[in-house]
C-alpha cells in the first residue's frame, strides 16, 4: 500500500488537475504528490495559557514532517478555557467544545483525505476531542500534549489554579487578608501550560501515553521546557512512520489498552472527567466499555502517586520521579497492565518499559512502590442507588468522612448554589444538590470547581456533601458526587429531591447515593413531575442539549444507533 493511499484520491489522474492546481498555489511540487499528506491539528490560542505555548510545538512538528518526506497540512482547532469560564454561563460551552473539536478534526482530515494526523492540544477538552476524532476516523494519528504548567510560588508554597479558587472561600470567611489573596491570584500561574496537578488535562495526557497514543515521558513534560519541543518533533516523525506502516488508532485503542489507561488514571489519582471522556473515546473507537468497567479496574489498582488536588505534588514533580513510564513499570510488574498492547512506536508496552527501573528512584515520595501504596484501591468510584440508577462518579480516597447523611439543600443552578455558599448559608452536615446542570438540562454539564473550592476554603470540604448532574473539575476534592444519571432534565430521581429531604452519600463500602424517602413518596413525586422547557432553543447549546446522550454513556452527540 502506498504512503499516500488516501491523499492520492485528490492528487492523481487527469480529472484531479484542478485539485493539483490548488496545491501548486501552496508551493507544492509534482514530486510532493507522491508523499503522504499529514494534518497538523494545531490548538494554539491566546485565549488561555494552556494553549498559548502550542505554536512552537506545531512548528517543530511541521519541520519534522517535512524532513521525513511528507507534506504538513496545518489547520486550527478551537478551545475553551475552563479556568476562565468557570462559574459562568461560558462553562456550558466547555464540554460542547469536546464535540466541536472532534468534529473539526474529522471534518478537515476526512474532507482533505489526509494520510495521517498529528493532534496538538492543551486545555482539558482538547484532549478527548482530539482522541475521539482519531478513533472515529481510524486514520494514523498521534496526540501531542502541549505540556503542563510549572507551579507558582508564594510564601514557600507551590500554587496551582485551584489555590486561587480555594482562596476565594478563605477570603470570604475572613481567614485570609487582601494582600495574600491578591498575591495568590497573581502568582498562581507563572507561564504557559495546562493546570499543574493531576487535573483533567494531565490526567488525560497520562492516560493517552499509557494507552500508547502518545510518546513515552511526553505527558508530564512542562510546556516551557525544550524537551517538549523535541518530543513534538519526534512525535511527528513517529507518526509519518506509522503512516508508512499503516498502524492505525484502532490497532492501538483496544479494550486492553483502555484498561491500561484507566489503571494509570487510578494509580495517579486522576480526574473524575476521565470517566466521561473514556466512555466517549471507547464509543468513538467502537470498543465495548461501560461505566461499570471503571469500578472493575478501581477495585484492583492502588493509588501510588501523591499528586494534587488531594495530594502534595504536581506533574513536574512526577516527571522528575520517572513520569508515567515509572508508574507503568510498577503496575506491569504487579500484573496490573497488559504488556502486549501495541503502541504508536510499533513497540509493545512491555518492550517500551524494558529499560525503566523496577522501583521508583530513592529520595522522592511522589511515586510509591505497590507495597507502600497510598490507598489499596483506586479513587474514582461508581456509586449507584435510588438517586442514580445509571451510576455517578465520586472521588473517595482521602475522605475523613466517607459516609454522610444530611438535609438536602436544593439548587436548580450552580449560580444559585454559589450565592448560598458565599452568603454562608450552608452548614456542617448539609448535602448540597445542584441539578438542571446535566448534558441536556444545562445544557453542557458545567464543572463545579467554584462551589466546591469555596466550600473547602470555608472549612466545609470534609463536612458538607455535594451532588450534581453536572461535572467537577479535575481540581475538585471532598465529599462530591457528579455525573448523576439520569439527569434532572429527563426526569432522573435527582429531579424529585425537595429541600430538607434526607440524602445519604456512602462512598465507603456500599457505594450508594440514596434519597431517604419511601417508594410510595418517590412514585407520587414522579407522577407530579413535569419536564422543564429547554433553556436554549437556538445555537450550539441547543444543538448539544438535543443530541447529547446520558452521562453514563459519555454525553456524546453521535450515539444514534444505541
UniProtKB/Swiss-Prot annotation:
Binds 1 [2Fe-2S] cluster per subunit. This cluster acts as a Lewis acid cofactor. Its EC number is 4.2.1.9. GO terms for biological process: isoleucine biosynthetic process; L-valine biosynthetic process. Pathway: Amino-acid biosynthesis; L-isoleucine biosynthesis; L-isoleucine from 2-oxobutanoate: step 3/4; Amino-acid biosynthesis; L-valine biosynthesis; L-valine from pyruvate: step 3/4. It catalyses: (2R)-2,3-dihydroxy-3-methylbutanoate = 3-methyl-2-oxobutanoate + H2O; (2R,3R)-2,3-dihydroxy-3-methylpentanoate = (S)-3-methyl-2-oxopentanoate + H2O. Its cofactor is [2Fe-2S] cluster; Mg(2+). One of its GO terms (molecular function) is 2 iron, 2 sulfur cluster binding. Keywords: 2Fe-2S, Amino-acid biosynthesis, Branched-chain amino acid biosynthesis, Iron, Iron-sulfur, Lyase, Magnesium, Metal-binding. It is an enzyme of class 4 (lyase). Belongs to the IlvD/Edd family. Homodimer. NCBIfam families: ilvD, PRK00911.1. This is Dihydroxy-acid dehydratase 2. It comes from Bordetella pertussis (strain Tohama I / ATCC BAA-589 / NCTC 13251). The gene is ilvD2.
